[in-house]
Structures are given as C-alpha cells and as structure tokens.
C-alpha cells in the first residue's frame, strides 16, 4: 500500500430527530461527491478497506480491523440496506463509510462518561480512505450532519489518526463503549 496515505477507520456515528433528506444521497464538495454505494463498487471498497488495514497496522493500530473485518458480507448488507456510501473524487472512489440513522446496540451502555443527548442519532461506521486525497473524514462528517443534527461515532484507542480527525471536526469525547466481542472503543458525539 501507499505509505503516505492517511486512512481512517471509524466505528459508530449516530443520529438525531432532525432527519434531512438522505434519500437524495448525493452531496458534492469541491471535486468530491458522496453517493450511496452499489454492488458494482464492492471490489473498490474492499481495496480501500485493505489499504486502511495496512495503514492502521503501520501506525500502531494492529487490532482494530482484525479477523477479516470488515468483510464483503457486511459490506453487501450495508449496501442492500442503503447504509453504505462512497466518496468519489474526479470519478474515482477515494473513500467509503456506513451511516445508519437509529439506535446502535453497542451504544446502549457507555462507561466513564455519558452521551450528550438521548435523542435519535446517526452512527458512522467503517470510514476508510484510499489515501489518495485529503479530507475524507471531514467530507463524511459534513455529509452526515446534513442528514441529521446529532451524530455518534467511536474508534479504537490506538487509532490516533481517526481520533485526531474526529476531535478536529468538533466531536465531544463521551466515554467508552464495547463492540460485539467486548473490545473497548472511545465514543464521541456531535450536535450541529
């Protein structure tokens, strides 16, 4: 993989009562466009996941996306549910994420803190960049906050790149949550 790439892997961003028109599904930012993923995008998205895993491993985060996660089956499930998105720059897929409005089961229990609000939220998962262009995380966050005004997200304690992107955008650190299997994640939320 490209050693200069900046890859972000994200688990969990949540939603708010002000749900905006997510069905349109396309937002442009400069040369970047965000659209819903299709099954035709799977090969490119899986390549981005591979690049993200390589980046994370090379930067001290060897365990966040282990054991084949995220795999093609979860990606197909996201696509079929309308929750998978790609970020396209000049016709090329340069990033991907999952965005789900509604309750995230792993967010029901939070330790060492609390959520800012208990209203409806959107959750960002599986955010990854090809490393070809900068600003993928910011583009994702800006898109999601236009869909609903309350977002939640979580990341691994070793994913310093993602923590930096989350905090730079203005997310508030809320505490710790535990994903399926019991692994701890740092939990954040953002209200626009």
Model-found features: residue ranges?
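A short beta-loop-alpha structural element at the N-terminal edge
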Residues: 33-47
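Conserved GNAT-fold acetyl-CoA-binding loop/helix
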Residues: 53-73
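A short helix-loop-beta-strand connector motif used in the catalytic cores of GNAT acetyltransferases and
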Residues: 73-86, 103-105
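Conserved beta-strand in the GNAT
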Residues: 86, 92-102
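Conserved acyl-donor/pantetheine-binding loop and adjacent beta-alpha core of acyl/acetyltransferases
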Residues: 98-132
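Conserved acetyl-CoA-binding loop-helix of GNAT-fold acetyltransferases
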Residues: 132-146, 164-168
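Conserved GNAT acetyl-CoA-binding A-motif
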Residues: 147-158
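Conserved active-site alpha-helix within GNAT-family acetyltransferase domains
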Residues: 158-175, 183
């Amino acid at each position: 993989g490209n050693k200069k790439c900046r890859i972000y892997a994200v688990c969990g961003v949540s939603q708010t009562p002000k749900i905006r028109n997510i069905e349109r599904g396309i937002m442009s930012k400069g040369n970047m466009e965000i659209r819903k993923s299709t099954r035709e995008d799977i090969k490119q998205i899986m390549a981005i996941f591979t690049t993200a895993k390589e980046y994370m491993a090379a930067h001290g985060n060897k365990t966040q996306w282990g054991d084949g996660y995220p795999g093609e089956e979860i990606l197909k499930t996201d696509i079929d549910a309308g929750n998978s998105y790609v970020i396209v720059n000049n016709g090329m897929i340069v990033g991907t994420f999952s965005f789900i409005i509604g309750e995230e089961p792993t967010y029901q229990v939070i330790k060492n803190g609390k959520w800012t609000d208990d209203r409806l939220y959107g959750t960002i998962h599986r955010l990854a960049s090809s490393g070809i262009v900068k600003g993928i995380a910011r583009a994702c966050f800006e898109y999601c906050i236009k869909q609903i005004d309350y977002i939640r997200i979580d990341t691994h304690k070793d994913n310093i790149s993602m923590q930096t992107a989350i905090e730079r955008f203005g997310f508030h650190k809320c505490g710790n949550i535990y994903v399926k299997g019991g692994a701890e994640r740092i939990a954040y939320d953002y209200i626009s």
